Amino acid sequence: MNNLLIPKKERHFLPNTIEINWKTILPFFDDLMNRELISLGELTQWMIDRSELESVLEEDFAWRYIRMTCDTTDEKILKAFEDFATNIEPKLAEYANLLNQKIMDCEFLYELPASEYFIYIRSLKKQLEIFREENISIFTELQLAQQKYGAIAGAMSVTIEDKEYTLEQASTFLKDQDRNIRKTVYETIQARRLKDRNQLDKLFNNLIAMRQQVASNAGFDNFRDYQFQALGRFDYNAKDCLAFHDAIAKEVVPILKSNSLKRASKMGLNNLSPFDTEVDITGKAALKPFANGEEL
């Protein structure tokens, strides 16, 4: 199994091992802020160092998020995620804006090969354009609110045949050849989700309100239009997406409907229900994946 490990890329700006907190990473941001860029070579190295710093932080946050979603009940893991969201990320946003401004002010920026850096520079300009300091705290609230959804969903479980299952585990029963079992499990799962309906509706409404505030602060009518710019979607717009939706409805949905009718016919059903879509129509039992690395 050790042969499957992907070797980590050697670092040149940061130590290969470093405990991530604001105190330990601040010196690297200060280095980037204070470094003089007096040649194209120094600008290029500055960009490489910044990329390494941001990559390390993105990976660290990603692992905190993954661990938190894998176990929403572990207080230590949750605290680590919230610490990054509340004590590191807001400061990162401030420094990111300052660093963006620094590079845009550099006289050597447009000496970089346009074919390689056009998209990067375009993104920098847009990030500076839509940045609003008042949105930093809202983004923190959004992170924490989104985490709450994961905690609520992760805590859901159902009892089937006197055994407790997570909803993900229970969904494997939807591949059972016995339709009565599939129906019972499907209804049990949906009933469990509905128990948290009010809580999730309130959370969703709060998320919508906060996202709309972010958009309004940045001068946009709605969060969709803001996100198009924030995510760098410069080569297509919302109208293009709506046209794509129409194309899917016209070209793909009829195919899916036809496939569903064929499935229902092969299963001897007049109507296909949501709990009939995962089962093997040839009568084969559901596949059982490997349980651990040794089996893999």
Regions found by a protein language model. Give the residues of each.
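Accessory "access/gating" subregions that flank catalytic or transport cores
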Residues: 289-296
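A well-structured
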Residues: 1-289
